[in-house]
Structures are given as C-alpha cells and as structure tokens.
Amino acid sequence: MSNTQGVISSISLSARVRPAAHVLGIRGGGWNAIVNERGSVRLNDGSPVLDWHIAADDRWHDPSTEPSVRQTRRAGVPVIETRLRIPGGDAIQRVYTVADAGGLVVIEITNESTLPIAVAFTRPDVISSRTPSPRGAQGIELPAGSVVFPVAHGSTLRVALRAAIHVANAVANAVANVDVERLPSFEQLQKGWLKAVEQAGYVIVPEGAVAPLVARLRSDARLLAIPTS
C-alpha cells in the first residue's frame, strides 16, 4: 500500500449525484455515524440528521441540491471532505470521529473563499467553543433549533456531536466540558488510520485509486466488525 498520506479518493458530483454512505467511528469501537454524498451526518442513535447550509455573498447555498458539490474520502480512510463552490472559492466540510469524551463526531467548516461566510447547522446540540449568532438563520427556512456561526475568510469552524445512546453521567459531563479546539485534527486522524490499516498487512498495488480503495475496505472492516468480547 502506498505510504503517501496526501492521496485522496475523489467522487465528483458535478453532473449526476452518486449515492454514498461513508461509515465513521472509532477503531475497535464500532461505527457511530454515516456521512452521505452531500455531507449530511446521521448518527446511529436515531436522532435527526445534521445538515449544513452556507450563506455566501450572493445567497444561501444548500449542499443537498447544489451542482457544484465535490466529495473526497481522504486516502480512503474515514475522513470525509465535501467541497461546495461559492463566490470567490470553496466552503469545505470535513467530518471524522475521535475517541475523546466517549466518542465524538467532529465537523469542520473551512472558508477558502475570498469573503466571509456563515454556516447553519440543523441541530441545536452541536458543541462549539464559539457562540452562535443571536440572529439565527435569516432568509432561509430551517428546522427549529438550527444554529448559525460566522466563518471568516481563511478560517475554520469546528463543532462536534455526541450520539445520545450509551451516554452515562460521567460521559455526559465530559462532553459538556470538552474543548473542541483541542480535539485531534483531521490530518492526525488520517495519519492514525493509515498507520492502522497498513499495519494490518502490506499490499503492493499500482499508484492511483487502488490504494485508497484498499484503505477504505480495511477501515470499514475495522468499524463494522462485531466485538468478540
């Protein structure tokens, strides 16, 4: 398997959308979320799907319908990157899972456009070190409780979600006190997953899309395996 940690497995959605279901979770701890081809996040606790919307200089952009969405699974491991074209550049969503506080799904929004933007999340229980905009979502109809955060040019907003199932009091307190800015980055998660899947055994494959595919199959197997204990 290739040791190149920047290799990206790409799915283009510019023409016809190809359905996708990316399984996220903790190595050895099972899966706890699925990300679809548009960046919607569904936890395994039956709670509402987390959708995202971007307010750019011209209007609100809905990734579930925009033709400019492109999605990548970085190096084949469970770090999902969804790009949305907006005036002046891209708004980028990255989703991955960390083991902190019993397991958190981390969602990052990076503004690579030349102008400030805002992002709306359709759930009120996202964990963030920032305070949501008191004005809420203006000019778009979203589910009750949706929250909006500004994202300056060149900056990244990070939030997290915790599945409601199996949340003991100690874990709930840990979630309440978590500092999302100190959670591992998507680069760290990518490196950790690559190391784990490569330790499972080396496979010599041609350069290109095959190595990320092998990494995806191995990482999905680790997430979906039934614990023996």
Where are these regions (language model features)?
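Terminal accessory carbohydrate-recognition/targeting modules of carbohydrate-active enzymes
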Residues: 1-224
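Solvent-exposed loop and edge beta-strand segments that line ligand/cofactor-binding
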Residues: 226-229
